[in-house]
Regions:
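Conserved blade-ending motifs and adjacent loop-strand segments that build the rim/top face
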Residues: 40-43, 199-213, 263-284
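Short, conserved, GDST-rich strand-edge loop motifs in beta-rich repeat architectures
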Residues: 235-253, 300-303
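Asp-box/WD-like beta-propeller blade repeats and closely related beta-sheet repeat scaffolds
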Residues: 65-68, 74-111
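Beta-strand-rich domains and repeat architectures in extracellular enzymes and scaffolds
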Residues: 1-19, 230-243
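Structural signature of eukaryotic scaffold interfaces centered on beta-propeller domains
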Residues: 1-4, 49-55, 100-111, 154-168, ...
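Blade-loop segments of beta-propeller domains
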Residues: 29-60, 64, 89-96, 152-153, ...
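Beta-propeller blade signature
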Residues: 22-24, 75, 126-131, 248-265, ...
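Beta-propeller fold detector
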Residues: 30-38, 79-93, 135-145, 192-207, ...
């Protein structure tokens, strides 16, 4: 979920019909949608949000299965939205055991670079891509490093599923299954620098068969991140879901807490939410925070940013 042109854009890769929806921020009503499952010009298989143009009129999506980027220009005409495919670019993904493997998540930086994350199978956690989607450098260690150089067991048995967000030329990653977050800054010359990384809670896991398995009571993790000029807003922590845990799903944790941090990763406050939630977004003018609930399904809460910041000062 992201804000653009006074609209909320929701990417729903599991929908049977349209994959991308737009909702009016003021009224909360659906005002447009596009994209189906397939191989046509506007079709995709598993789209994920990457970024938007500086003017806010173009949305960039990464189609995980098709291994490409598609950008769509959105034009408002009275009460109608018009969608047009602006460009399509294939992307070279890293190889895992001799086969190309798609990035799990990608974000766009203001200086034109992209950052991709591949959770398993590679030596470095992040990959920096230039504006033409060519690899510049692979960088960054995996979040769990107490196993030294023996990454074979980690990359075969641990899911580092997480949320990736950007602001300016900084990228922020938060792990879904444990309380870890990091920030890297990317220079205009394409040089990544680790600014900080923090672990906010004990990671409850055990080692078995040369791999790491998270325990059921490990209920801490970040589901989604949104970043503004001063703050990081993250949905954090949650409740265990036994059925999902037994199926080894990374969705076993459903957040019910909103955490606010500064750009140094220091927590400033937290708020208990009424419902289990997933994604969070900030309006283009910075006046509102939007939270997408899981239960009830796809309900979106609109909260005044002023109210949140006032609570932090109490």
């Amino acid at each position: 979920m992201v804000s653009m042109q006074d609209m909320l854009c929701l990417v729903r890769p599991n929908e049977n019909e349209s994959l991308v929806y737009f909702i009016d921020e003021k009224t909360g009503k659906e005002i447009g949608y596009f994209g189906g499952i397939g191989q046509g010009p506007g079709d995709m298989f598993l789209p994920k949000f990457v970024g938007k143009s500086s003017a806010g009129d173009t949305i960039i999506l990464h189609d995980f299965n098709a291994r490409n980027f598609k950008a769509f220009t959105i034009t408002k005409r009275d009460t109608t939205l018009l969608f047009k495919l602006a460009y399509k670019k294939d992307i070279a993904h890293p190889e895992v055991d001799g086969a190309s493997c798609g990035f799990n998540t990608v974000c766009k930086l203001d200086n034109g670079y992209y950052v991709g994350v591949l959770y398993l199978g590679v030596d470095k956690f992040y990959t920096l891509l230039d504006k033409d989607l060519n690899t510049v450098i692979a960088y960054g260690d995996y979040p769990l490093r107490e196993f030294g150089e023996d990454k074979k067991s980690l990359k075969e048995h641990v899911s580092f599923k997480g949320t990736l967000a950007s602001h300016g030329n900084s990228e922020f990653y938060g792990a879904t299954r444990f309380g870890y977050m990091s920030r890297y800054d990317i220079s205009d010359e394409g040089v990544p620098e680790l600014v900080w990384e923090h672990t906010y809670s004990d990671i409850d896991y055990r080692v078995s068969n040369n791999g790491v398995k998270f325990q059921e009571k490990n209920v801490y993790g970040f589901s989604h991140i949104a970043v503004t000029d001063k703050y990081i807003f993250a949905t954090f922590s949650g409740i265990p879901n036994r059925k999902m845990f037994e199926e080894r799903s990374t969705y076993a944790v459903s957040p019910k807490t909103l955490v606010v941090l500064n750009h140094d990763g220091v927590p400033l406050g937290r708020f208990k939410l009424n419902s289990r939630c997933h994604s969070v977004a900030v309006s283009g003018d910075g006046e509102y925070l939007y939270i997408q609930d899981i239960d009830p399904e796809d309900q979106i809460e609109r909260i005044r940013m002023k109210d949140i910041l006032e609570k932090l000062r109490e």
